[in-house]
């Protein structure tokens, strides 16, 4: 990699890189707790990086570069995707599952899935659809994932076991990456693999630079089930500042009043001010100075951005903020439609987010 300079940010090249790498990042298998293949792909993508890298006991992949600045900054993007885990294989060879992360039952019907065995083999399967022979089941929505099963073409439990499939194996729902018009792409696990790309790209842009802070780029595990990887990483690293990279709900779609928009697709990056798990429990109120600093960088460099002031859910930053006596924490995101299903992003928002993070880091040296 060549040493980059601040004024040489090339939007066209970043967009090209995203279109080339997101297909691999999206398709790779990585439900919560089973992120090894994602980590291996990231290491391939960053094979030429001059950052050192290591892996901790929870599987977080940590890239580190000690610049000339005194501030220790942790930027996190989670590797895991929502998925399923096998809880039972019945006598007829049907596979019953539970969730890894936040699924709604209506997202399961008729989906293609990939099961990964302990030996690393990928096996195709299909989730059942509505029962056309039972009209009552065509008008009611299943209330639980326990009403769904996976078909792998076997006729007995023993036949399933002979494929290498066992209880405890993880399952990924498969959506191929597709291009939608000029700027949009749809795919699986863009939450958070689009942000994994962004963090990879920031590491690549900082190749050879000394005028950066003490920077940790952390590809975290198990965010979708409680930010477990980020908690461990931040506890061990003890950063002064922690920024979580994640999606922001793009709700600019039919049926949603404009007053309820959280973010808008194609209008720039997103700076988080607040999120929450419930009315008064959990979530994040981003540190005001960090929000001001990010907004200033965006304005100074004419980077379009939106503000996320409210949303259900939480990110890695929500859990890192109160560690080690308190961390300056916040979030930078990309707007995303149809989260936790066939997710859609805009490549312009991705490029804006890369630029915001890159330029922000260079102000912190």
Regions found by a protein language model. Give the residues of each.
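N-terminal hydrophobic/helix-forming segments and targeting peptides
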Residues: 1-365
């Amino acid at each position: 990699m060549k040493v980059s300079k601040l004024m040489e940010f090339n939007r066209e090249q970043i967009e090209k890189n995203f279109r080339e790498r997101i297909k691999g990042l999206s398709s790779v298998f990585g439900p919560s707790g089973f992120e090894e293949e994602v980590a291996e792909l990231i290491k391939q993508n960053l094979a030429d990086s001059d950052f050192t890298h290591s892996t901790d006991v929870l599987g977080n992949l940590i890239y580190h570069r000690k610049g000339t600045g005194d501030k220790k900054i942790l930027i996190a993007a989670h590797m895991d995707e929502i998925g399923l885990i096998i809880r039972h294989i019945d006598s007829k060879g049907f596979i019953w599952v539970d969730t890894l992360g936040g699924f709604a039952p209506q997202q399961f019907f008729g989906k293609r899935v990939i099961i990964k065995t302990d030996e690393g083999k990928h096996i195709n399967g299909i989730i059942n659809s509505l029962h056309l022979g039972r009209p009552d089941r065509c008008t009611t929505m299943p209330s639980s994932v326990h009403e769904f099963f996976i078909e792998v073409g076997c006729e007995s439990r023993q036949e399933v076991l002979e494929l290498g499939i066992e209880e405890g194996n993880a399952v990924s729902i498969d959506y191929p990456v597709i291009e939608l018009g000029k700027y949009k792409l749809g795919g699986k696990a863009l939450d958070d693999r689009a942000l994994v790309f962004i963090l990879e790209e920031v590491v690549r842009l900082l190749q050879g630079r000394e005028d950066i802070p003490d920077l940790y780029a952390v590809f975290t595990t198990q965010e979708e089930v409680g930010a477990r990887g980020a908690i461990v990483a931040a506890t061990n690293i003890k950063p002064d500042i922690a920024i979580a990279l994640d999606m922001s709900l793009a709700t600019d779609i039919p049926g949603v009043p404009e007053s309820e928009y959280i973010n808008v697709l194609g209008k720039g990056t997103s700076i988080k001010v607040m999120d929450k798990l419930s009315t008064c429990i959990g979530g994040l109120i981003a540190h005001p100075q960090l929000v001001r600093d990010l907004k200033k960088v965006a304005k100074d460099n004419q980077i379009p951005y939106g503000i996320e002031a409210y949303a259900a859910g939480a990110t890695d930053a929500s859990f890192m903020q109160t560690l080690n006596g308190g961390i300056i924490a916040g979030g930078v995101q990309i707007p995303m439609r149809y989260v936790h299903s066939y997710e859609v992003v805009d490549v312009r928002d991705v490029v804006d987010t890369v630029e915001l993070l890159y330029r922000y880091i260079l102000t912190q040296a």
